[in-house]
Amino acid sequence: MMVLLHAVYSIVFVDVIIIKVQRYINDILTLDIFYLFKMIPLLFILFYFANGIEWHKFETSEEIISTYLLDDVLYTGVNGAVYTFSNNKLNKTGLANTNYITTSIKVEDADKDTLVCGTNNGNPKCWKIDGSDDPKHRGRGYAPYQNSKVTIISHNGCVLSDINISKEGIKRWRRFDGPCGYDLYTADNVIPKDGLRGAFVDKDGTYDKVYILFTDTIGSKRIVKIPYIAQMCLNDEGGPSSLSSHRWSTFLKVELECDIDGRSYRQIIHSRTIKTDNDTILYVFFDSPHYVPIL
């Protein structure tokens, strides 16, 4: 695995989604969300095509809650609905009100459904993409109780997330659904309260490894930010004792360093992986106390 660092000098802090062209598929460009800020109501989505720029306006002002790209379909979660963009068409599926759609995920079960999950007025719930109920998947773990940033991934039918499964629970990284084994979670206070800044699965030899990225904050008078990447085996079987049987036994973290021209970048803002023929390249977007981003 390789981390590429490249300075970014022209970042403008505005309430928009910046979407970068990734590749051509079925006459539509697959889109890679380069950076996403917390946004006020957004009126349109901007897409880049081979023949120029095209604008797709929402019918009403919407606050963007989440965005996911699954099988060349862009899912955009808002309050009470999810928008899908595919084959140059923008569609809307209405769901319950006071329901912030934080998650769109491909569940690799027998039905291979795409689920959309939301807060559902403090009672997390999942639906199929057509808006019908999904009785097979609980909402807990798939969506938070209140609108907040989440990290959730699915690999070979196994679902992992940093979403609390109880209202007052401690933030943890969990494997909680699928054929990889029983539920596992990190120890107390390993995951920061604001959650992760990326997660992905990559093969290391014959084993599938899970990687997560986050920034830890230590100190009370003098605050210090420490960026980490951690790994664990996807098929981890837990610890040997009754107290550790549901803890990750292969969890290992290492500090990331990003020092350029004498300046240290210590806070992870966003991360993204790009797979090549021979490797997986990890891009990490760092920030510094001076608010000068770096990639």
UniProtKB/Swiss-Prot annotation:
Residues 1-295 form the Sema domain. GO terms for biological process: integrin-mediated signaling pathway; positive regulation of cell migration; regulation of inflammatory response; semaphorin-plexin signaling pathway. It comes from the Viruses. InterPro entries: Semap_dom, Semap_dom_sf, Semaphorin, WD40/YVTN_repeat-like_dom_sf. One of its GO terms (molecular function) is integrin binding. One of its GO terms (cellular component) is plasma membrane. Gene3D superfamilies: YVTN repeat-like/Quinoprotein amine dehydrogenase. In the Western Reserve strain (WR), the A39R protein is intracellular and not secreted as observed in other vaccinia strains such as Copenhagen strain (COP). The WR equivalent of the semaphorin-like protein is split into two ORFs which are likely to be truncated and non-functional. This ORF would be the N-terminal part. Belongs to the semaphorin family. This is Semaphorin-like protein A39. It comes from Vaccinia virus (strain Western Reserve) (VACV).
